[in-house]
Amino acid sequence: MMQDATDPAVRAALQSQPSGLNSTDDWRQVMDRIMSLTARNPDAFRQQPQANRLSAILEAVVPARANPTHEKVLAIVNALAENRAIRPDEAGLVYDALLQRVARYNSGNVQTNLDRLVGDVREAVAQRERAQQQGNLGSMVALNAFLSTQPANVPRGQEDYTNFVSALRLMVTETPQSEVYQSGPDYFFQTSRQGLQTVNLSQAFKNLQGLWGVRAPTGDRATVSSLLTPNSRLLLLLIAPFTDSGSVSRDTYLGHLLTLYREAIGQAHVDEHTFQEITSVSRALGQEDTGSLEATLNYLLTNRRQKIPSLHSLNSEEERILRYVQQSVSLNLMRDGVTPSVALDMTARNMEPGMYASNRPFINRLMDYLHRAAAVNPEYFTNAILNPHWLPPPGFYTGGFEVPEGNDGFLWDDIDDSVFSPQPQTLLELQQREQAEAALRKESFRRPSSLSDLGAAAPRSDASSPFPSLIGSFTSTRTTRPRLLGEEEYLNNSLLQPQREKNLPPAFPNNGIESLVDKMSRWKTYAQEHRDVPGPRPPTRRQRHDRQRGLVWEDDDSADDSSVLDLGGSGNPFAHLRPRLGRMF
């Protein structure tokens, strides 16, 4: 018997027996254990707190079950030590490791806690469902009570009536913040989802009682429409989203109304033709202003008012990045002589990764703006890079980049348009102008003998020239070219000719033909132009005198100022640099 008691398996089997009352227990033994608590000093036990007395009674009736796990583990460790599987000094370490593993993977407390957690979750879900359906349950009870007062069959449209009642049940069940209640003899449906709306179900069904299955004529629906009350129309509007084309027949009047309400509620997008329609109407009324039209459309379509754009500015970090980019790009441009686009790319490659990662949107926008500025207006790009106080324009922050266009430096950019504007002229003025032009052409063929004649000839052409300021500027400058006069070429240029009067008085019916003949008569062939050009004069020998020595010589090779400045190709332009050798006569 003692051997069975020392056996670990037997001990484990004994300790794993369930505690408490069973078939083998006797109620007399239980009563003896309870009475033994008060046998020694009944008054002392009676004077203890109620919780202590209740705990002692419960422990005496149902003793607590002892946990045999550590005893089993200890028996296993002892058996291992007796069989020399482990050394005695390793018994404590193995015992502790086994207890931890049993507590982790095979613990009754863990399994119990999991079971309790699953039960708690199920209870919470059940309570949530009951809480959510508590209002709908009351509404469904009230709705069933209302439907019990209504007839189950109708004379016409039985299928539509049944489907309508099913849609009503679905609306009461699925619509949040709604309820069905009874007030007096009538039943009401109330919803507060999009404003408080209440429908008297009793009065609505009484109004719809004779309209089930009614097919109104297509042309005249006013007679049937006058039978519906606003209360019934509101019920149809609320129940329309819960119906479809198959539930209620579209041929009936009620089905037609439900379809109209359903399509009106489901159409949430704006018609695409609205903008064109309002634009055409505004133009028909005479409102051609695009700005006011867009503002009106913006208010009509979106019901939004225009806001004043906010002022944008750079913070300290962004301004520091801007100055760094300016210095780096200017250094690349001046040191390496690269193009602006390449300089910007070099600056982007040399930028610190951390700074780029923290300011990626601003740096990308800045580089994009500078690339566009360099492509559209290089001068603006250069000024922006070299200006240490430059800040981006407002369009830089909004995304609408505005780069001023560059000035290409064309000559017509600086000429006043009023020079080419037509001026009213009479027939007498036209004849006087033509005579002056003819006289000026004749004078241009005569070569001036001196510079004084050249200077005197210029003022005569000022009166008839359409550019008196340009001619005056030519004559005011000092020049010694022998073929300086260009009045003939200037006057024969069709682009610089003064505009003639195209529409003369009605006395000249063939004015268009005469102007065409006049233009064709001024045309010259290449041979005529070559023949009309005056030939160059033979070079004259100039004599120089030396009054001190009495020497006179002819200068054949030396070139005066006029020959040096003559770019026509005659003479040696470097002859004045050669030593001067005289010849005595």
Swiss-Prot record:
Pfam families: Hex_IIIa (PF02455). Induction: Expressed in the late phase of the viral replicative cycle. The modification Phosphotyrosine is found at Y490. Cleaved near the C-terminus by the viral protease during virion maturation to form the mature protein. Residues 14-24, 462-475 have a biased composition (Polar residues). Residues 571-585 form a propeptide. It is found in: Virion; Host nucleus. Its main location: virion. The record marks S570, G571 as: Cleavage. Keywords: Capsid decoration protein, Capsid protein, Host nucleus, Late protein, Phosphoprotein, Viral genome packaging, Viral release from host cell, Virion. GO terms for cellular component: host cell nucleus; viral capsid, decoration. The modification Phosphothreonine is found at T274. Gene3D superfamilies: Pre-hexon-linking protein IIIa (1.20.120.1500). The modification Phosphoserine is found at S225, S310, S444, S449, S450, S452, S469, S473, S494, S515. Residues 1-24, 438-475, 528-573 are annotated as: Disordered. The keyword DNA repair does not apply. Interacts with hexon proteins; this interaction tethers the peripentonal hexons to hexons situated in the facet. Interacts with the penton protein (via N-terminus). Interacts with packaging protein 3; this interaction is required to promote correct genome packaging. All late proteins expressed from the major late promoter are produced by alternative splicing and alternative polyadenylation of the same gene giving rise to non-overlapping ORFs. A leader sequence is present in the N-terminus of all these mRNAs and is recognized by the viral shutoff protein to provide expression although conventional translation via ribosome scanning from the cap has been shut off in the host cell. Structural component of the virion that acts as a cement protein on the capsid exterior which mediates the interactions between the hexons, including the peripentonal hexons, and reaches all the way to the penton vertices. Two hexon linking proteins IIIa, one from each facet, stabilize the unique edge interface between a pair of facets. As the virus enters the host cell, hexon linking proteins IIIa are shed concomitant with virion acidification in the endosome. Belongs to the adenoviridae hexon-linking protein IIIa family. This is Pre-hexon-linking protein IIIa.
